[in-house]
Amino acid sequence: MVTNLYQNMRANALADAELRRKAADELTCMTARINRGETIPEPVKQLPVMGGRPLNRAQALAKIAEIKAKFGLKGASV
């Protein structure tokens, strides 16, 4: 629910009043679902899990060179 509101706010440049109205509408819909006895699923994490260790200097430079070569950018050799 929050993610949808946030995406809508960003995509449509909603003002505070519009966002509050849409949040109230979402809460009304959620209340109706609960009152009907519908089971509400557990929230799903949508943030990616960032893993791994940072690259060392040599690995970082190699990665930059790879990206430059892939896209044909100037200075492809490091």
Swiss-Prot record:
Coiled-coil stretches noted in the UniProt entry, renumbered to this chain: none
Top-rank taxon, per record: Bacteria
Biological process, per Gene Ontology: DNA replication initiation
Miscellaneous notes: Encoded by the cryptic lambdoid prophage DLP12.
Family: Belongs to the phage P protein family.
Annotated protein name in UniProt: Putative protein PeaD
Organism of this sequence: Escherichia coli (strain K12)
